[in-house]
Amino acid sequence: MTYKFPDNFWWGSAASGPQTEGAANVDGRKPSIWDHWYKIEPGRFFNDVGPTNTSNFYYQYKEDIALMKQTGHNSFRTSIQWSRLIPDGIGEVNPKAVDFYNRVIDEMLANNVEPFMNLYHFDMPMSMQEKGGFESREVVDAYATFAKTCFELFGDRVKHWFTFNEPIVPVEAGYLYDMHYPNVVDFKRATQVGYHTTLAHALAVKEFHALEIPEGQIGIILNLTPSYPRSQNPADLKAAHIADLIFNRSFLDPVTKGEFPADLVEIIREHDALPEYTEEDLAIIKNNIIDILGVNYYQPRRVKAKEYAAHPDAPFMPEHLFDNYEMPYRKMNPYRGWEIFERAIYDIAINLRDNYDNIPFFISENGMGVEGESRYRNADGMIEDTYRIDFIKSHLKWLHKAIEEGSNCHGYHLWTFMDCWSWANAYKNRYGLVEVDLDNDFKRTVKASGHWYKELSENNGFED
């Protein structure tokens, strides 16, 4: 069967500044929370590999953009590091950072690769974290100023802007589950961070629309993880509804509809965790919705009704309201510990079609991390990652079905272009179309999937 996609479909990939640029201590950049956390707890990073060098994009961006073109990219998303552009979080703009991002943008355009630019990818400047991070209203305003600065500096050439990547992740990883700095476990503080992140997003949208950039669009990148109940039993259905409210609709509803779900607000109120807010700020959220949505999809969430009550003195967690459910015989990526469930990408698209005014969206991340890929190297030195090609195809088939049924999808970006640093997992799992050899001066080698991806893009689809 032939799977053809709409004209002008975005084929490309996504990455981020902190995961690829390296040059962490170069040309005026100051520490983010990742530099600080690695400094004080290097043992929490796989093989003690920190964020200092990552994949060396700062120095090899020209080679990398040429490889993007070679692997069929017509678009690519990365992020501007706040700690590089405005090293103190507020105040003076770093001219060397402006020069770097200008060169990257211009090189992309010269190679017919459309830049998609994100403003925040988990990388709070340490100077801002010391003020409380997104617990602080002052930092919300500082972020809005940073966003406006980016729009003014680069908006003449960058038309596709995104305020945050996966904003739920710093909330849950940094303030609930002790997986990111500042390693807080406190539901009320987490809700304050989530609310202030939403407000910061809305303020950036307001600044962007005020500039009236021709053909400009602004959106947000959300990791939508559909919540599937174990059964159709009412208690299981309620568990799935609650998980969906907390992990998906907490951001999806306010950025598309301008308001938080009433059921979610009630849950937060019941657990005495309402954030500090003002009516003026709620109006800003209400009046500044997105133009386009980026959807990151990796895995489903399967849940069931609680089997045992939580300890009454334990800190409240979302899992006090549902249990995670491990479906028997599910297909897994054993390296990442994630279920592979391709149909969910269809379910997301149809949900957006039916419940969110069929908002324009694109798949902004989807990918497969594999450990020890060098064992798949052939005699010519190329990694034969046919498993990645199969993974992409199987998801695109379901995306194609959703498009045929009227969902408003405009593109597909793989995570990721080249092997990159994955936070505390460092380089444990590799996701790229292009191999990066950390032991050989960051040498780049296109994998089998990269050659196939060029065919996919050139044909605007594939046969299978």
Regions found by a protein language model. Name each.
Residues 74, 83-85, 122-124:
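A short acidic, glycine/proline-enriched capping/turn motif at secondary-structure boundaries
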Residues 60-81, 287-292:
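Catalytic domains of carbohydrate-active enzymes, especially glycoside hydrolases
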Residues 80-93:
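Glycine-rich, proline-tolerant flexible connector loops at the mouths of alpha/beta enzymes
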